Amino acid sequence: MLSPKKTKYRKQFKGRIHGTAKGGFTLNFGSYGLKSMEPERITARQIEAARRAITRQMKRQGRVWIRVFPDVPVTGKPAEVRMGSGKGSVEYWAARVHPGRIMFEIDGVPDDVAREALRLGAAKLPVKTRIVTRIDAAVEHA
């Protein structure tokens, strides 16, 4: 699973996800992409589950690019532990995803296979998504 090799600090504040994506909202690598339509924290496990679903549907043909990286440590305290005594330990890593962010890109497979693969990948994610293509992206930003 994805996680940073090294961080400046071990724990972070929770933070909020305000506004739309300031970058990463256009297709840069593949012909098809999966775009987030709402703000959410996506865990490393969810990213990996979506990646596996996409590659399985593509039957290991073509190429998949993961455009989000889980760099936010999420902490938690064990069950039935009293409040206080400091912040809990890091339990998992998450990525903050803004609306409009391209999360996955694929290329090298037919149109129907690409759309089905991204649909199955989207089912593993906790956000509403939209499948975008190179043609759609060109029309949007023209």
Curated annotation (Swiss-Prot):
GO biological process, one term: translation
Pfam families membership: Ribosomal_L16
Keywords: Ribonucleoprotein, Ribosomal protein, RNA-binding, rRNA-binding, tRNA-binding
GO molecular function: rRNA binding; structural constituent of ribosome; tRNA binding
SUPFAM superfamilies in the record: Ribosomal protein L16p/L10e
GO-annotated cellular components: cytosolic large ribosomal subunit
InterPro entries, alphabetized: Ribosomal_uL16, Ribosomal_uL16_bact-type, Ribosomal_uL16_CS, Ribosomal_uL16_dom, Ribosomal_uL16_sf
Subunit field text: Part of the 50S ribosomal subunit.
Similarity field: Belongs to the universal ribosomal protein uL16 family.
Function: Binds 23S rRNA and is also seen to make contacts with the A and possibly P site tRNAs.
Protein name, per record: Large ribosomal subunit protein uL16
Source organism of the structure: Phenylobacterium zucineum (strain HLK1)
Gene giving rise to this polypeptide: rplP
